[in-house]
């Protein structure tokens, strides 16, 4: 905050019962989140001024489990965690963060969008039960220069997957350095009516696990984002220090934030790839045999946990020409 940050995160990236189970600290999860939010809020209030208010984002990490990827090569249908397991854990975390008086919620470092959706669903449940709402930020992570998340989604597919939620912002953090992140930030910027955030690492870690990009190096790279009108929110992830934040704040003061584009209303779908249906699109084939309400066979396969055969039904639909499966 003293370096010039407008928003600070709570120290709760791993603040779920799922992540804390590795340390036998499940019973401490409420206190971890509540106290972290409370302390951060007290400091933010202390440093805030009428001209520059400061805000606290409740940090919600991806957990150390994935709902979309099997850890067993020999059993692709196996999962360490279910959607409901994640939803319940995230709900506990969100309740504690809100009780600690955070100003917004940040679902960050998303490598599996299904995990993210569980967090967003949990947030919506808590909002309804507590009759309170705060802004929601979502930040994914592109694993490498293939341009995909760990679960295989492109940047646009990731955007489409969460755009049903009225987010404050969407963006990327971690994993890549600033320059490598640029094309994916631009893609979000061009195709989203949400604010865009970017808080990359200080480059990639070296052989000693340390980060080499200085505040000046990162500042020049992020200045390109600002000068090009790509972002509304900037910051730093792994390897960044108060010196980095001070440099970002100094540079950001010179530029206007990105203008929100007005986009045409279109059907936007996503799997691992994005599909946008436009007036110019050819006929869109939808395969409906993977619908438990429309196919007795598929419903039986799902009830019997025969996911290998269920997958073959989906594959047959795609090979028969379906661009979308229902």
Q: Which ranges hold each PLM region?
A:
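Domain-level signal for soluble alpha/beta catalytic cores
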Residues: 1-326
């Amino acid at each position: 905050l003293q370096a010039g940050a407008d928003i600070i995160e709570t120290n709760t990236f791993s603040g779920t019962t799922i992540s804390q189970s590795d340390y036998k600290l499940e019973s401490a999860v409420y206190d971890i989140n509540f106290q972290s939010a409370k302390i951060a809020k007290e400091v933010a209030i202390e440093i805030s001024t009428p001209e520059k208010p400061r805000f606290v984002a409740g940090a919600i990490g991806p957990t150390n489990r994935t709902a979309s990827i099997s850890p067993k090569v020999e059993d692709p249908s196996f999962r360490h965690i279910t959607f409901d397991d994640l939803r319940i854990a995230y709900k506990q975390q969100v309740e504690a963060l809100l009780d600690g008086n955070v100003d917004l919620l940040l679902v960050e470092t998303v490598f599996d969008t299904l995990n993210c959706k569980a967090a967003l669903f949990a947030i919506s449940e808590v909002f309804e039960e507590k009759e309170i709402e705060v802004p929601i930020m979502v930040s994914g992570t592109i694993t490498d220069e293939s341009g995909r998340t760990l679960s295989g989604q492109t940047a646009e597919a990731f955007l489409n997957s969460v755009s049903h939620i009225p987010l404050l912002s969407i963006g990327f953090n971690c994993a890549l350095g600033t320059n490598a992140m640029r094309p994916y930030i631009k893609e979000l910027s061009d195709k989203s009516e949400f604010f865009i955030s970017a808080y990359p690492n200080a480059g990639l870690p070296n052989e000693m696990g340390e980060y080499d990009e200085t505040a000046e190096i990162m500042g020049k790279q992020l200045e390109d984002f600002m000068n090009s009108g790509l972002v509304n929110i900037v910051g730093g992830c792994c390897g960044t220090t108060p010196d980095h934040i001070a440099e970002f704040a100094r540079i950001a003061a010179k530029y206007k934030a990105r203008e929100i584009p007005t986009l045409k209303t279109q059907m936007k779908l996503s799997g691992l790839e994005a599909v946008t249906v436009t007036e110019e699109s050819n006929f869109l084939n939808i395969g409906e045999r993977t619908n438990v309400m429309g196919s007795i066979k598929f419903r039986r396969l799902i009830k019997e946990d025969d996911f290998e055969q269920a997958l073959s039904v989906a594959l047959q639909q795609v090979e028969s020409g379906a661009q979308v499966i229902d």
